């Protein structure tokens, strides 16, 4: 009996006391192994690209257009962040992709996806872009302009604040959705020039099927890595800096976000690789910066065969250098046929705007099997000694300088734009600075006597909220501040004659929604009044117009005391800004708006389109 009891007890004891310690250790071990396995698998699984649905591909005319999803996270960031280490110093190693080296100096940057310049977008013609702008930079009201895209189906996606949309407040997301309908090398940038100069700008390339490209025979390679974005770099402009009359000098020119300064001569430079014997199509966009001086671009010992301007094809021009104003783009072809090596790509600001403002990059011949070189390969192109410039000046008379008026478009001026135009609009503008005391300079900017100001609500999407008293009068003003709108009937053929009365410097204007044919351009060397200009234009003594094959552009450099005549057919209804590109922030008074068509002609924004106007205007009291 007793022994039975004992046995039972022993059994009980052994059942009651399993080894808990060991069991939990085993479980922990098993769980750890599983967890480690999961981590290994996750670690080695390639993550889908977070920001881009990559539309950078070979374009084919029979392919369906793609939907290109882009997420642009806008932040205040800095150059030389931790990840850079000492990569901008001598023997500091390569800079990691996450490092913004700029010109090797520390500075705040306004970035999209922590990149400088903003990531280049490559799409095919007719792709649909869906761009989420996630705005995380306090104190900036943003809108992004897609330069070069007419936005005919979606005028409310043009990114002009208070015209086509309410500027986006910080900590919100705005979705741009539009069709890339205009082929060519373009740009996208913050509407505010200060924000663009602080980094929020990049290249935007719309390619077409090689079979549809009329100049395909001229090149072998059109690759995304041969896109060049040049920008001015210097002191941050900040929202208030734009208000001062004297803009500080820029300090360097960056090529694809890289350059050097005297302080850091070892900062990395951009390189563009080529193989001997191939012809490369390069795409160049100049985004400007705080000062936005015109720049001269060249590649040592290489000829640039310029084939497009602002995305429009021209009769090819073989030149040694190209001079561009802010916002202009060119495509050129480089025949890589020099003694393989490294050649300098140079940009320099025009001296009359700022001396000693330069940037460099490298053209690198990849070390593939070297071809036998003919001794005179180097000489062939030395015969070319010409410059192409979009900036008209006295130099145009020289045989070695090809100016805009001497360049021929690849296509003829449409017949309806050759004569009997429906409307001619004369637009005098005057930007002048005056020394008002030994220390102070004051500036005035007016177009037609009106100082441009933005309306309180976006004209296209909330036009009804804008009081009639905010608009400028039709007659020339007396320096009044108002919303300057010029009305054009839908479908009219238009000639816009713009002329500079101030004579301070060149001026650059960019038209949204259209590109125009530059039928006339000239320096007048002094101020003329509207009556005289009108008379001269009607008599045909103002210019020797090119009504056969003038170049087509969307950005124009109006020479100092100069006049230009721009023609287009007003077939894109909406509110389109003629933007003064030298403005360092939102405006300095020279901008104006073209209202094409009537409210009923406008493509309506979707009903849930974000709106301005929950704030009570300053003239109301809540109590
Ligand atoms: C341009 O503006 C300045 C400053 O307001 C003025 O002194 C000058 O007379 C103007 N020039 C013309 C041609 O209107």
Task: Give a label for each model feature.
Residues 88-91, 100, 112, 220-290, ...:
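Acidic-aromatic/histidine active-site loop/patch
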């Amino acid at each position: 009996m007793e022994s039975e009891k004992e046995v039972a007890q022993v059994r009980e004891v052994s059942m009651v006391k399993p080894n808990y310690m060991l069991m939990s250790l085993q479980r922990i071990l098993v769980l750890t192994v599983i967890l480690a396995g999961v981590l290994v698998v996750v670690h080695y699984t390639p993550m889908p690209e977070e920001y881009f649905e990559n539309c950078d591909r070979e374009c084919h005319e029979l392919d369906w257009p793609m939907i290109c999803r882009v997420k642009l996270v806008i932040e205040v960031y800095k150059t030389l962040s931790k990840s850079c280490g000492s990569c901008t110093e001598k023997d500091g190693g390569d800079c990691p992709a996450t490092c913004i080296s700029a010109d090797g100096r520390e500075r705040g940057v306004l970035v999209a996806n922590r990149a400088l310049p903003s990531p280049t977008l490559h799409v095919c013609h007719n792709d649909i872009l869906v761009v989420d702008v996630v705005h995380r930079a306090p104190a900036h009201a943003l809108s992004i302009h897609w330069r070069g895209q007419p936005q005919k189906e979606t005028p409310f996606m043009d990114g002009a604040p208070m015209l086509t949309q309410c500027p986006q407040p910080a900590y919100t997301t705005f979705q741009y959705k539009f069709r890339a309908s205009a082929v060519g090398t373009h740009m996208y940038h913050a509407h505010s020039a200060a924000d663009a100069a602080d980094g929020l700008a990049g290249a935007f390339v719309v390619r077409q099927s090689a079979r549809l490209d009329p100049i395909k025979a001229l090149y072998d390679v059109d690759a995304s890595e041969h896109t060049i974005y040049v920008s001015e770099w210097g002191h941050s402009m900040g929202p208030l800096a734009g208000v001062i009359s004297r803009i500080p000098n820029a300090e360097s020119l960056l090529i694809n976000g890289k350059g050097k300064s005297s302080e850091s001569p070892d900062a990395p430079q951009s390189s563009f690789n080529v193989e001997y014997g191939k012809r490369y199509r390069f795409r160049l966009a100049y985004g400007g910066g705080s000062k936005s001086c015109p720049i001269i671009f060249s590649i040592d010992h290489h000829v640039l065969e310029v084939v497009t301007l602002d995305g429009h094809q021209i009769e090819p021009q073989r030149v040694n250098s190209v001079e561009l104003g802010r916002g202009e783009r060119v495509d050129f072809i480089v025949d890589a046929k020099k003694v393989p090596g490294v050649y300098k790509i140079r940009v320099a600001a025009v001296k009359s705007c700022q001396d000693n403002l330069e940037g460099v990059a490298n053209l690198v011949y990849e070390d593939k099997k070297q071809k036998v070189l003919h001794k005179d390969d180097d000489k062939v192109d030395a015969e070319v000694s010409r410059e192409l410039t979009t900036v008209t000046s006295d130099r145009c008379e020289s045989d070695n300088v090809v100016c805009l008026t001497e360049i021929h478009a690849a296509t003829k001026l449409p017949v309806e734009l050759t004569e009997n135009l429906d409307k001619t609009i004369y637009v005098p503008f005057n930007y002048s600075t005056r020394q008002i005391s030994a220390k102070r300079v004051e500036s005035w900017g007016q177009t037609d006597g009106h100082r441009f100001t933005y309306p309180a609500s976006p004209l296209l999407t909330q036009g009804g909220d804008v009081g009639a008293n905010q608009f400028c009068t039709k007659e020339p003003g007396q320096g009044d501040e108002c919303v300057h709108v010029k009305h054009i009937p839908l479908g009219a053929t238009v000639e816009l004659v713009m002329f500079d009365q101030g004579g301070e410097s060149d001026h650059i204007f960019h038209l949204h929604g259209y590109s125009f044919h530059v039928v006339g351009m000239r320096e007048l060397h002094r101020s003329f009044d509207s009556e005289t200009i009108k008379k001269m234009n009607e008599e045909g003594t103002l210019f020797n117009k090119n009504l056969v094959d003038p170049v087509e552009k969307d950005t124009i450099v109006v020479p100092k005391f100069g006049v230009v005549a721009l023609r287009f057919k007003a077939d894109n209804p909406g509110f389109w800004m003629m933007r003064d590109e030298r403005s360092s922030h939102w405006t300095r008074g020279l901008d104006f708006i073209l209202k094409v068509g009537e409210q009923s002609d406008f493509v309506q924004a979707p009903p849930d389109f974000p709106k301005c106007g929950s704030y009570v205007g300053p003239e109301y009291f809540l109590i």
